[in-house]
């Protein structure tokens, strides 16, 4: 049994996003780069993007030495879901502000879950 956290997992949902941004690997790549840079994270490679056909969304994954950063976009609903797991403590990041800037989000919910605590 652990009595301390082994990291934090952020679960982020952003609603009312611009559908064209949610279909853009460029926009999502810039967002990932900003998250990584501002939080001092360390990529273990390049992001991998899967673009769904037609008007579908994008699934993205970036392996980090600290764990991972992932997103799933739903342009038809104006929604992006983001998951960031870090095995070390990180400062709070302005998810609301950054997702409004990057994707035009109207509403952002953020949950920070300590991992490994019993």
Model-derived features: where do they sit?
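Polybasic/polar functional segments that serve as interface/processing modules
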Residues: 1-118
């Amino acid at each position: 049994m652990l009595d301390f956290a082994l990291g934090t997992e952020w679960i982020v949902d952003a609603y009312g996003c611009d559908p064209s941004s949610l279909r853009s690997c460029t926009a999502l790549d810039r967002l990932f780069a900003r998250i990584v840079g501002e939080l001092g994270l360390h990529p273990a490679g390049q992001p991998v993007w899967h673009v769904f056909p037609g008007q579908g969304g994008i699934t993205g994954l970036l392996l980090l030495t600290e764990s991972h950063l992932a997103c799933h976009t739903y342009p038809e609903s104006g929604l992006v879901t983001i998951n960031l797991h870090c095995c070390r403590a990180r400062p709070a990041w302005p998810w609301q502000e950054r997702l409004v800037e990057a994707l035009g989000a109207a509403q952002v919910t953020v949950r920070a879950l300590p991992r490994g605590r019993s």
